[in-house]
From Swiss-Prot:
The lineage of its organism: Bacteria, Bacillati, Bacillota, Bacilli, Lactobacillales. The active site is at H140, K161, D179 (proton acceptor), R245. It comes from the Bacteria. Residues 203-212 are annotated as: Important for the catalytic mechanism of both phosphorylation and dephosphorylation. Pfam families: Hpr_kinase_C (PF07475), Hpr_kinase_N (PF02603). Keywords: ATP-binding, Carbohydrate metabolism, Kinase, Magnesium, Metal-binding, Multifunctional enzyme, Nucleotide-binding, Serine/threonine-protein kinase, Transferase. This is HPr kinase/phosphorylase. NCBIfam families: hpr-ser. Residues 266-271 are annotated as: Important for the catalytic mechanism of dephosphorylation. Its cofactor is Mg(2+).
Length: 313
């Protein structure tokens, strides 16, 4: 979890244009993901002005300032240019008013821009800051992208998680993280997992050591991060434990405030775990699209029992 994001990093990661204040990019930081679009502030009402937020100007805001005199624009911009304001951000590649550039220069505030529409730019910056500023936790497991689904493979040490991930990579799927997965909540329904920088693209295989998946299999075999859609827990087979054979039992595991579907796969000699997990991901996708093989089987079984009962009567 980062406490803040510098304007320099924001410009680099989101490929923003710098109109002015390039010398202040490193020192200016933002600590909130919320963005402010000035409204009443442009009329001179500054009660509850969120000076600590990025100030976003779109077509509406810029055109409104054009109806002011130069003196009025300069006065308003100077009041908005608090020393704690991270930056002024302008959408649609609009030309910033001269008074904005002057007030920003006086207060050491960068003026940034983008060719995106105001709504898209707002969403892009908010999502980016949410990801950078979100609380992070570490989980033990392996995260793999299987057919576009983020599958977190968990289980006791030595159960075969990394070996299974290696087989999945050979089958064309993509590795995100091995051994340690850093997770954060992106929104109310989404949890994202990524690898720590030092472990990125690396996989540890007992007896072989550490391998670099990207160098061995190419850039298409790895991803930086992915949302976690399914948890597959590998558990050593036990005769004393009952396992779900129909897939009717639904489990969930809470990660932050998000319930993530979970299935338990018993590990036994001779079972191809990579194929099992691959099929589990495909089956999960089918269920999310409205087809449930278990419910179909139960419905057909019910019809058969009902038909046999009618024949006996």
């Amino acid at each position: 979890m980062a406490d803040s994001v510098s304007m320099e990093r924001l410009v680099t990661d989101l490929k923003l244009q710098v109109y002015s204040g390039e010398a202040h990019l490193k020192e200016k930081i933002v600590t909130l993901s919320d963005i402010s679009r000035p409204g009443l502030e442009l009329t001179g009402y500054f009660n509850y002005y969120p000076y600590e937020r990025i100030q976003l100007f779109g077509m509406t805001e810029v055109s409104f300032t054009q109806n002011m005199t130069a003196e009025e624009r300069l006065m308003i911009m100077r009041r908005m240019a608090s020393e704690n304001t991270p930056c002024f951000l302008i959408s649609r590649s609009l030309e910033p008013p001269k008074e904005m550039l002057q007030a920003a220069e006086e207060s050491g505030i960068p003026v940034l821009g983008s060719n995106l529409s105001t709504t898209r730019l707002s969403s892009l910056v908010t999502d980016y800051l949410d990801g950078q500023l979100a609380e992070r936790r570490s989980m033990h497991g392996v995260l793999v992208d299987i057919y576009g689904l983020g599958v977190l493979i968990t289980g006791d040490s030595g159960v075969g998680k990394s070996e299974t991930a290696l087989e999945l990579v050979k089958r064309g799927h993509r590795l995100i993280a091995d051994d340690r997965v850093d997770v954060y909540q992106q929104d109310e329904r989404t949890v994202v997992g990524e690898a720590p920088m030092i472990l990125r693209h690396l996989l540890e295989i007992r007896g072989i050591g550490i391998i670099d998946v990207m160098n061995l299999f190419g850039a298409g075999a790895v991803r930086a991060d992915t949302s976690i859609s399914l948890i597959v827990h590998l558990q050593n087979w036990s005769q004393d434990k009952k396992y779900d054979r129909l897939g009717s039992d639904t489990e969930e595991q809470m990660i932050f405030d998000v319930p993530v579907p979970k299935i338990t796969v018993p590990v036994k000699v001779g079972r191809n775990l990579a194929i099992i997990i691959e099929v589990a991901a495909m089956n999960f996708r089918a269920k999310s699209m409205g087809y449930d093989a278990t419910k179909t089987f139960e419905a057909n079984l019910g019809k058969l029992i009902e038909s046999n009962s009618d024949d006996e009567n």
